[in-house]
Amino acid sequence: MFANTTAGGVYRWSDGNVSTVLEKRRGIGGIAVHADGGFLVSGRDLAYAGPAGLRTVWAADGATGLNDLTVAPDGSVVVGVLRHQPRRGEAAGPTELVQVAPDGGTRVLASDLLWPNGVGYAPDGTRLYVCEYAAARVRVIGPQGASVFAEAPRGECDGLAVDVEGGVWVALGSGGGIARFDSGGALVELIEVPGRFVSSLAFAGTAIYLTTIGALLRMDVGVPGSEIPAAAMQID
């Protein structure tokens, strides 16, 4: 599945065919599969999409929206909070990355991120990586706190995915490509995607699917992605 952030909606690609899964909702920065077969989407809030339609499960006070997200090993959801209006040209100020537990309780994992974007866990679940779009870097959050993990070789750090070897893949936005960093933060691969703004990426086996402005692309990178569990948030 993938979202059209500007025009709105969630779509499914299968065997060359695209179908609409959720209509109209704009500003979606992330999607996560839920354990009951529905899915969660960000946007103006964190919402559950199921047979009965959309239902808000969490919203951040004073936020302009919620951006990219992932699922933690315990089934909780980690999501970046937006507090500026990027479409109005507002500069990004420090904001939070929040973990929303299955029972709805929250914990702030970081509070000084400049436009939190792509987010993903290391295969062993001990470290969490998050892109800072406005700072063009990736931060890592671990037992000792948060630190800078890697800097974008060009462009920005937008979407993020992690492979089973601990490699961290980053969509480089206006940089026209994707980068792979090893678990120590060293750049080990830079793949060109000419003429494209690469906004996000996700694994399916050894293939990476890339979202760009106007296109969905696929490439095989020879290593599978780290498994992301289904969200276990309670839906009333």
Cite the ranges covered by each PLM segment.
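Beta-rich, blade/repeat-based domains predominating
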Residues: 24-43, 61-84, 94-96, 110-127, ...
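A short loop-to-beta-strand structural motif that recurs across blades of beta-propeller domains
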Residues: 9-11, 45-47, 88, 95-98, ...
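Short loop/turn segments that connect beta-strands within beta-propeller blades
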Residues: 13-17, 49-53, 100-104, 142-145, ...
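Beta-propeller domains
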Residues: 1-23, 46-47
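Blade-level signature of beta-propeller repeat domains, shared across WD40, Kelch, NHL, RCC1
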Residues: 198-236
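Loop/turn-rich, solvent-exposed surfaces of beta-rich toroidal or solenoidal domains
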Residues: 136-139, 148-183
